[in-house]
Swiss-Prot record:
Modified residues (Phosphothreonine): T176
Protein name stated in the entry: Zinc finger protein ubi-d4
Cross-link (Glycyl lysine isopeptide (Lys-Gly) (interchain with G-Cter in SUMO2)): K10, K99, K107, K108, K178, K196, K281
Lineage, highest ranks first: Eukaryota, Metazoa, Chordata, Craniata, Vertebrata
Residues bearing the modification Phosphoserine: S142, S200, S244, S280
Biological process according to GO: apoptotic process; apoptotic signaling pathway; chromatin remodeling; negative regulation of myeloid progenitor cell differentiation; negative regulation of transcription by RNA polymerase II; nervous system development; positive regulation of double-strand break repair; positive regulation of stem cell population maintenance
Length: 391
């Protein structure tokens, strides 16, 4: 080995060799320092999550070699029991009880009060380190041994919990704070009730739209509208006005939504146009009175001329629960997902997903388009035929 080093020194020069070794030392020091800061880390080369280890030694830890050909030796690290170990259940392996003569030793050292307090009470209260005794533990990164306790009795007291207090650096576990809550089981019923309450609150947040009639919840307004149209609309049409009042709401959020809806389940309409800010008495763009068209989901209103409705479309929107462009959902699947695939009828303003149609479409057609409902109702007067005739 020495001959190889001498050959390299002769070939490159002594100063060059010293500079190279110094740079290598600096690189290794930076690499080790970086790894020690971010441990445990995921090794990008091997894909293995590296845990903390004790192979990094300082120059002050070096000792003379113990074997032939050994330049340095380093002190071995003290073995310590893992904190995950459980107390033995076998009575033969349990810790022996403290004898009366040991109690006398404890009283002399001031570890047990003279008023006869039991050892169990001493162990249940704060640890002895917190009562003024010095902490026997040394930092995990140091290589020093634990100092020997001043009496056998004190070591006997600390021995059952010693495996809990000696937290090894290799144990990166999430259950570290579990020791603090030992013996606190009074609020278990309150905690379970609080968890149920939190779960109901989270469900209300995930599904804020509730049905006023049956209390079923939905994540978005189009889903609730689809539920109204297919579940309760037929029942509401055949019932009287007194019988159509919704029952008691299931939650406070339902009560808030109930105040915003009419007896027929429709949202209370706004009395002004969202486009020109006029009302039914005057359209601020034309200066003429014009009735408002209101969304059945959000209650927003607009003049037909502001919405660019044709006379046929104006008559059609009065026959169903019309939705504004922000609340529009597919008339077939009832969802508002993939709104870029929605195709609107030029006769009734209903929306359809192009992939929900039969046959399905990949691209929107050129010119006007009429849905199957308007084709059956208007026949040759549908917009699609008017567009073909004009062309």
């Amino acid at each position: 080995m020495a001959a190889v080093v001498e050959n390299v020194v002769k070939l490159l020069g002594e100063q060059y060799y010293k500079d190279a070794m110094e740079q290598c030392h600096n690189y290794n020091a930076r690499l080790c320092a970086e790894r020690s800061v971010r441990l445990p880390f995921l090794d990008s080369q091997t894909g293995v999550a590296q845990s903390n280890c004790y192979i990094w030694m300082e120059k002050r830890h070096r000792g003379p070699g113990l074997a032939s050909g050994q330049l340095y030796s380093y002190p071995a690290r003290r073995w310590r029991k893992k904190r995950r170990a459980h107390p033995p259940e076998d009575p033969r392996l349990s810790f022996p009880s403290i004898k009366p003569d040991t109690d006398q030793t404890l009283k002399k050292e001031g570890l047990i009060s003279q008023d006869g307090s039991s050892l169990e009470a001493l162990l249940r209260t704060d640890p002895l380190e917190k009562r003024g005794a010095p902490d026997p533990r040394v930092d995990d990164d140091s290589l020093g041994e634990f100092p020997v306790t001043n009496s056998r009795a004190r070591k006997r007291i600390l021995e059952p919990d010693d495996f809990l207090d000696d937290l090894d650096d290799e144990d990166y576990e999430e259950d570290t704070p579990k020791r603090r809550g030992k013996g606190k089981s009074k609020g278990k019923g309150v905690g379970s009730a609080r968890k149920k309450l939190d779960a109901s609150i989270l469900e209300d947040r995930d599904k804020p739209y509730a049905c006023d009639i049956c209390g079923k919840r939905y994540k978005n307004r189009p889903g609730l509208s689809y539920h109204y149209a297919h579940s309760h609309l037929a029942e509401e049409e055949g019932e009287d006005k007194e019988d159509s009042q919704p029952p008691t709401p299931v939650s406070q959020r339902s009560e808030e939504q109930k105040s915003k809806k009419g007896p027929d389940g429709l949202a209370l309409p706004n009395n002004y146009c969202d486009f020109c800010l006029g009302d039914s008495k005057i359209n601020k763009k034309t200066g003429q009175p014009e009735e408002l068209v209101s969304c059945s989901d959000c209650g927003r209103s607009g003049h037909p001329s502001c919405l660019q409705f044709t006379p046929v479309m104006m008559a059609a929107v009065k026959t169903y629960r019309w939705q504004c462009i922000e609340c529009k959902c597919c008339n077939i699947c009832g969802t508002s997902e993939n709104d870029d695939q929605l195709l609107f009828c030029d006769d009734c303003d209903r929306g359809y997903h192009m992939y929900c149609l039969t046959p399905s479409m990949s691209e929107p057609p050129e010119g006007s388009w009429s849905c199957h409902l308007c084709l059956d109702l208007l026949k040759e007067k549908a917009s699609i035929y008017q567009n073909q005739n004009s062309s």
